[in-house]
Amino acid sequence: MRILYWGTPAYAVPTLRQLHQAGHTIVGVVSQPDRRRGRGQQLVASAVKQEALNLNLPVFTPERIKKDSDCQAQLAALKADASVVVAFGQILPLEVLEQPPLGCWNGHGSLLPRWRGAAPIQWSILDGDAETGVGVMAMEEGLDTGPVLLERRLSIGLQDNAHALAEKLSGLTAELMVEAMPLIEAVGAGPTDERLHRLGVQHQAEASCYARMLCKQDYQIDWSNSALAIHRQVMGLYPGAQTSWNGKRLKLTQTEPLIDRLKDQLSPEAQELVGQWPTGGHAGGTVLACIQDLGLVVSSSGCPLLIREAQLEGKSRSRGQALVQQMAAAEQQSIGDN
C-alpha cells in the first residue's frame, strides 16, 4: 500500500518503522514543525521526523495543516492509498480526511470510547482504570469518534507509570496497525459507509470521558488527598508530579500506597510497613518515618504513602538511603504546603 504517515512524538516512531519494514510504500511523512528545546533553545526535529529522515522519506512540517492549502495540495499529489495517523498533534480537516481512497486510520492510545482527547494514557492511570489498550479507528471530523476496526487490551498495574505504559502501548499500536493494513487494502476503495460496513467496524457508544490536556496545576500534589490518589498522580504524570521541601521543588517518581487491600500489589518491603501507622492524627504531608534503605513514609488522607524515589530541585534523582540523606529529613517535618 501507498501510505501517508502522520505522527510527531517518540510514541509514533514504532508504527512508522514497522509499516516501512512490512513493505508498504511510505509516500510521505507529516510531522509537527521543529521546536526550540533545552537550555540552549536549539531547534529540534520531532522524533518521527528524525526517523523519517533516517529512512530517506520525504517530510512535511506544516504549522497548521488546516490552513495550509499548499501543503494539502502537495500531499494530495502523493496519491496515497491511505493515511495512518498516530499522535500527530493537529486535527485534520475534512478535505484532508477525504483525500485517500482507502481512508484515514488513527492509532489511538486508549480504549474507545472510554478516553477521547489529548492525554488518554495519563488519564487512564489518574482515574484508576484497571485496563487500557489501543485501537485502530476510522477517522472522521469528530475528535476520536470514528468506528473501531481493531483493538487490543492491556492491564494497568499499580506500579505502571505513564512512560512505561506508553512504551507498551506504542508497540501494540505498531503491531495492530500492521495487522490492519491488509484488511483495509482487501476491502478496496468505494463509498466510506460501504467500505466500513465490509470491514465490520464497531461503532462507538456515545458515553465517553474527555482526556483533556494536562496543565501545571495537575502536577501539584495535594497532601490532603488519599495515598492512592497521590500515587496515581505520581504514576500518571511521571516524572512530573511535584511537591515542595524546605522551599525547593521535590518531584516524586516512585511511591507505594501503604493500603491493606492493595497489599498483594506492593513490594515485599512495603508490605511489611502496612498497618504500622494509625490512620488520622497527622496533617497531610507529615513525615512519619525515615527508613534508610527504603525512603520516607508520609501521611496523607487515610493510609500513608511510601516515597521510594524523588528528585530534589538542583539534585539528581535519588532513592532509598540516598534520598533520606539528600533531603536530611526527620520525623514530624512537613512536605508541601499543606
From Swiss-Prot:
GO terms for molecular function: methionyl-tRNA formyltransferase activity. (6S)-5,6,7,8-tetrahydrofolate binds at S110, L111, L112, P113. Belongs to the Fmt family. One of its GO terms (cellular component) is cytosol. It catalyses: L-methionyl-tRNA(fMet) + (6R)-10-formyltetrahydrofolate = N-formyl-L-methionyl-tRNA(fMet) + (6S)-5,6,7,8-tetrahydrofolate + H(+). Its EC number is 2.1.2.9. Keywords: Protein biosynthesis, Transferase. It comes from Parasynechococcus marenigrum (strain WH8102). CDD domains: FMT_core_Met-tRNA-FMT_N, Met_tRNA_FMT_C. This is Methionyl-tRNA formyltransferase.
